[in-house]
């Protein structure tokens, strides 16, 4: 069984390399037209340059997975901000895509919790479609839209989970097919359990990104030993491996919050289940220390008898 690793957005080992420098709408509105354009251009340019720097870091360290920042382009989906970020930065988008393709990196996006399809308010669904379209357009500008995924949560329950799930199935049909085809769903830590998310994924033929920490925080009745093979099977129509999110609790009191590093004892039960299934898969580390947490976990795992480190961020078990 081969397990590959990656991390989210910021490479903490790199100095001053945030790919998500921001600009608020309030500050944008205070500026004159040319100042607005200049500020948006400069912040986006810096985020793109930092993304390229991070990708080179990943390539040098043989890290095959990476979650791109959703905030590369500030105010990209704000209705009052007109900024042709695709055309203006076309050469840089292509450069990023070429790096990703040349080195066979697996990249993804994860829009924020407000991008959901369970609301009974039409404008919420409209905003979700706008946000998903932004992420897809960026992937398309990179030339990797057909091989990369956009991950979201199911959404809220609004006091009636069954009705909310019905709305999800109804609202998701409004998302253009070419974008829906590149989306994944993740179980969450409070509302939609692993089994509930799996049922939605199976019905909509959407790959399931399983989050182990969320699963433990929001358990369902079905044992994970039975669910995980079905979760992995939701990826069978794609050309990529199943992906899993790993983090561990900050403390008993703050159980849902992510710790700086991974507690190996916390994830061992999950790893033993995957060993029984013996299916290759990818792990996205969601700890606060990101790449450093990932590398520390790989070192700890590679010291276990029977686990072999193939390269910097890939293990064989």
From Swiss-Prot:
Keyword line: DNA damage, DNA excision, DNA repair, Endonuclease, Hydrolase, Nuclease
Q: What is its EC number?
A: 3.-.-.-
Top-level lineage group: Bacteria
What does the record give as the function of this protein?
Component in a DNA repair pathway. Removal of UV LIGHT damaged nucleotides. Recognizes pyrimidine dimers and cleave a phosphodiester bond immediately 5' to the lesion.
PANTHER family of this UniProt entry?
UV-DAMAGE ENDONUCLEASE
Name the protein family.
Answer: Belongs to the uve1/UvsE family.
For this entry, the protein name equals UV DNA damage endonuclease
Which organism is this protein's natural source? Bacillus mycoides (strain KBAB4)
Q: Write the lineage as a comma-separated list.
A: Bacteria, Bacillati, Bacillota, Bacilli, Bacillales
């Amino acid at each position: 069984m081969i397990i590959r690793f990656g991390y989210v957005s910021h490479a903490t080992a790199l100095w001053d390399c945030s790919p998500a420098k921001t600009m608020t709408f309030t500050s944008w509105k205070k500026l004159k037209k040319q100042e607005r354009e200049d500020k948006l251009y400069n912040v986006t340019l810096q985020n793109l340059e930092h993304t390229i720097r991070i990708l080179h870091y990943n390539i040098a360290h043989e890290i095959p997975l990476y979650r791109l920042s959703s905030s590369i382009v500030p105010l990209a989906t704000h209705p009052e901000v007109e900024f042709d970020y695709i055309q203006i930065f076309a050469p840089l988008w292509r450069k990023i895509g070429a790096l990703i393709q040349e080195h066979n990196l697996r990249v993804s996006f994860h829009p924020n919790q407000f991008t959901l399809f369970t609301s009974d308010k039409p404008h919420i669904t409209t905003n979700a479609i706008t946000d998903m379209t932004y992420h897809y357009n960026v992937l398309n500008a990179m030339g990797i839209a057909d091989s990369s995924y956009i991950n979201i949560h199911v959404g809220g329950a609004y006091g009636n989970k069954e009705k909310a799930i019905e709305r999800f199935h109804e609202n998701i049909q409004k998302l253009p097919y070419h974008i829906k085809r590149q989306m994944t769903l993740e179980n969450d830590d409070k509302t939609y359990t692993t089994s509930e998310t799996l049922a939605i994924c199976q019905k909509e033929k959407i790959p399931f990104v399983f989050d182990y920490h969320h699963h433990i925080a929001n358990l369902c009745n079905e044992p994970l030993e039975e669910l995980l093979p079905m979760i992995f099977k939701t990826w069978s129509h794609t050309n990529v491996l199943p992906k899993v999110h790993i983090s561990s609790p900050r403390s008993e009191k703050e159980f849902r919050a992510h710790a700086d590093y991974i507690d190996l004892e916390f994830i061992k039960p999950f790893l033993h289940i995957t060993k029984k299934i013996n299916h290759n898969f990818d792990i996205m580390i969601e700890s606060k220390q990101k790449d450093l947490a990932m590398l520390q976990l790989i070192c700890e795992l590679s010291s276990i008898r029977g686990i072999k480190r193939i390269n910097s961020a890939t293990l064989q078990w």
